[in-house]
Amino acid sequence: MNQYHDLLERILGEGTEKHDRTGTGTLSVFGHQMRFDLASGFPMLTTKKLPFRSIVHELLWFLRGETNIKYLKDNGVSIWDEWADANGDLGPVYGSQWRSWPARDGRGIDQIANVIDLIQRNPDSRRLIVSAWNPADVDRMALPPCHCLFQFYVAGGKLSCQLYQRSADVFLGVPFNIASYALLTMMVAQVTGLKPGDFVHSLGDAHLYSNHLDQARLQLSRPTRPLPTMTINPEVKDIFAFRYEDFRLENYDPHPHIKAEVAV
């Protein structure tokens, strides 16, 4: 995961101090790209421990089209608690846009089902896109989508994915996002009969919060370890049929967790 460490070093070395919505303050760079070959191991950080269970359940929650945190709470995941209202609702966030984008004629467009169908019918299409950024709904979301658009690409029997992330909390959020979209790429590859290719992560405003700088330096002081491998139940051929038990992370040997506060 040297790609991620390079990003930390770039922000610490050349980042611009900026004010932000949370009032915490950041060091920020604009425009950065990382590429991960999914055949070379599952891109889960080894220089600090990440919560595999939370990453998987959040992705399954997105794919269920849900926007209430009940499913997450029922599965011991608390990463969205700070943004939910008293009823656990978040407004029309990721799951709603992915699975039921509101069309002008009143239909809900299932972008996930549509993109999988298009990959199978026309793998050379340049329209293999899913967007979570809906200007008509942004003001009703508890948190507008940070990872807001992704595109698939098929070549040589392999499926690659590029994510555009407008706002990237590099210490806390980005490691989650890398693992989540790498896993999504592997899942979509399996249900479309392809092999996983690359995950490409393109960042807009990539930042370290001012209260994460010491933690980033600590992480950079740790040597990287071999990447783990991800095994997915090969019997699952429907993207919406996956369960937590269908995923097995093997040979994950990270350094200890590094605590950092979330900026809300």
UniProtKB/Swiss-Prot annotation:
Cross-referenced PROSITE patterns: THYMIDYLATE_SYNTHASE
Active site: C146 (nucleophile)
UniProt keyword annotation of Methyltransferase present: yes
GO biological process: dTMP biosynthetic process; dTTP biosynthetic process; methylation
Gene3D superfamilies associated with the record: Thymidylate synthase/dCMP hydroxymethylase domain
Annotated pathway: Pyrimidine metabolism; dTTP biosynthesis
Entry keywords, A to Z: Cytoplasm, Methyltransferase, Nucleotide biosynthesis, Transferase
Top-rank taxon: Bacteria
GO molecular function, one term: thymidylate synthase activity
Subcellular localization, as worded in the UniProt entry: Cytoplasm
InterPro entries: Thymidate_synth/dCMP_Mease, Thymidate_synth/dCMP_Mease_dom, Thymidate_synth/dCMP_Mease_sf, Thymidylate_synthase, Thymidylate_synthase_AS
Subunit structure: Homodimer.
Function in brief: Catalyzes the reductive methylation of 2'-deoxyuridine-5'-monophosphate (dUMP) to 2'-deoxythymidine-5'-monophosphate (dTMP) while utilizing 5,10-methylenetetrahydrofolate (mTHF) as the methyl donor and reductant in the reaction, yielding dihydrofolate (DHF) as a by-product. This enzymatic reaction provides an intracellular de novo source of dTMP, an essential precursor for DNA biosynthesis.
Similarity comment: Belongs to the thymidylate synthase family. Bacterial-type ThyA subfamily.
Name of the protein this chain belongs to: Thymidylate synthase
Organism: Nitrobacter winogradskyi (strain ATCC 25391 / DSM 10237 / CIP 104748 / NCIMB 11846 / Nb-255)
Source species taxonomy: Bacteria, Pseudomonadati, Pseudomonadota, Alphaproteobacteria, Hyphomicrobiales
